[in-house]
């Protein structure tokens, strides 16, 4: 099914901003999970502007509907919620049919649980133009089919996915979706950036410090923390006597802090007594200039465990839903993920 127009949801035209601070993205993630013996597959969809989730749909909710996750989107009128909910329900049904088709095509048992994930959306440059568009599916955690960067052709992961590819090509789906990406997706993104500019266009700098953890009489771990920053894009590096220690650095993925901001750390194991030779370097758009930190032997502030635990709790909650499943998969398919539309069948 081809992309549908959402511009009719909005009364009045958005006054376009000629330039934007940096690039921005609109992403729609969906996950459909079959559960034999327990009814229809569960469908969860979440929508993001940059690193901020602002919409969520769960077919298992008491009243399944698209729900706001940010105050700035609550201002939308009843027609907006009726239509976005309608799209989510239509996409849920499409993915349920797709799950049954894939089960048959892969000759799999109906007794097992299977997952179909989707991600689509657009990246917009500072000039307001399309940087890149996305339309991807994964089945049981593996890439299935994706729209190529040229927005004209598809990459199928196997012979089963080639069936979907031939269907998309016969329906000229790439052309229709490209029209959506270059037009409506960017229009929606601009609108959301304007309505939520106080939240979405902020740049909260990280609070950074170094923690020292002795391992033995001969070694210690230096862990460089960056806390409370937004957006999620950040660079943490360790240097020894001015030389980057890329191979020896343990670096965790950026994770939510539980309050709309993010946290991250990078660690190195160093010989005891040589700590002063190591410096941590932090780069983030919220900083007027990069930070350089060196561990000092004086008492350090206690690591804010509550904030860290909150972040882990949030991350764990997301794992049980759809978001982290999509994020784990998108690591392979996107650097950093749509406006609502009715999905094509798989």
UniProtKB/Swiss-Prot annotation:
Residues 22-305 are extracellular. Residues 1-21 form the signal peptide. It is a single-pass type I membrane protein. Keywords: Disulfide bond, Glycoprotein, Immunity, Membrane, MHC I, Signal, Transmembrane, Transmembrane helix. Residues 204-295 are annotated as: Alpha-3. The chain crosses the membrane at residues 306-329. One of its GO terms (cellular component) is extracellular space. InterPro entries: Ig-like_dom, Ig-like_dom_sf, Ig-like_fold, Ig/MHC_CS, Ig_C1-set, MHC_class-I_related, MHC_I-like_Ag-recog, MHC_I-like_Ag-recog_sf. Gene3D superfamilies: Immunoglobulins (2.60.40.10), MHC class I-like antigen recognition-like (3.30.500.10). Heterodimer of an alpha chain and a beta chain (beta-2-microglobulin). Belongs to the MHC class I family. This is Patr class I histocompatibility antigen, CH28 alpha chain. It comes from Pan troglodytes (Chimpanzee).
């Amino acid at each position: 099914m081809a992309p549908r127009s959402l511009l009719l949801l909005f009364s009045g035209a958005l006054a376009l901003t000629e330039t934007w601070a940096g690039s921005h993205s609109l992403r729609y993630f969906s996950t459909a999970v079959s559960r034999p013996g327990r009814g229809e597959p569960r469908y969860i969809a979440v929508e993001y502007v940059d690193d901020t989730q602002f919409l969520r749909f769960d077919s298992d909710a008491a009243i399944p509907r698209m729900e706001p996750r940010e105050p700035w989107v609550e201002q939308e009128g009843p027609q907006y919620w009726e239509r976005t909910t309608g799209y989510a329900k239509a996409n849920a049904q499409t993915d349920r049919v797709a799950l049954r088709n894939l089960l048959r095509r892969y000759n799999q048992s109906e007794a097992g649980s299977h997952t179909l994930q989707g991600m689509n959306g657009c990246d917009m440059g500072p000039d307001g133009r399309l940087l890149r568009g996305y339309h991807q599916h994964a089945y049981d955690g593996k890439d299935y089919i994706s729209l190529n960067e040229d927005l004209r052709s598809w990459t199928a992961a196997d012979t089963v996915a080639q069936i979907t590819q031939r269907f998309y090509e016969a329906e000229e789906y790439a052309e229709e979706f490209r029209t959506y990406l270059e037009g409506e997706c960017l229009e929606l993104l601009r609108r959301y950036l304007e309505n939520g500019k106080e939240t979405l266009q902020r740049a909260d700098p990280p609070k950074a410090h170094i923690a020292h953890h002795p391992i033995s009489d001969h070694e210690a771990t230096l862990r460089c923390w960056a806390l409370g920053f937004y957006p999620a894009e950040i660079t943490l590096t360790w240097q020894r006597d001015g030389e980057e220690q890329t191979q020896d650095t343990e670096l965790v993925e950026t994770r939510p802090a539980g309050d709309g901001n993010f946290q991250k750390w990078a660690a190195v194991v160093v010989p005891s007594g040589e700590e002063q030779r190591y410096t941590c370097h932090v780069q983030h758009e919220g900083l007027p200039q990069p930070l350089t930190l060196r561990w000092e032997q004086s008492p350090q502030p206690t690591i804010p465990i509550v904030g860290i635990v909150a972040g882990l709790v949030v991350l764990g909650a997301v794992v049980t839903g759809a978001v982290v499943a999509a994020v784990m998969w998108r690591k392979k398919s996107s650097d950093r993920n749509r406006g609502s539309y009715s999905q094509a069948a798989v």
